[in-house]
């Protein structure tokens, strides 16, 4: 959950009304806005994605980094590598139950870089 860090960056930008754009610099992770109240939502999303893009599928030949390598790329393609969030009142204008997340598609945690650009006045 990177919501607090993003809100802090938006606040420091001085922009009151505008747009916050986020971009992840990786091909095996993605960004999403989803419910922030019930952790079961995240587990359900993981289970769903594992069902439609299973690790170790013999269809995938790109497996140099392990059986989760190519499935992670496919999962990233099926989701989002960038987000655009409106800024109002100097904050990301998210719904009550919305949070901004980096979704890691590999089994092991990796360092991920996200660029946040805030535009507006």
What are these regions (language model features)?
Residues 1-121:
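Active-site histidine-anchored catalytic micro-motif
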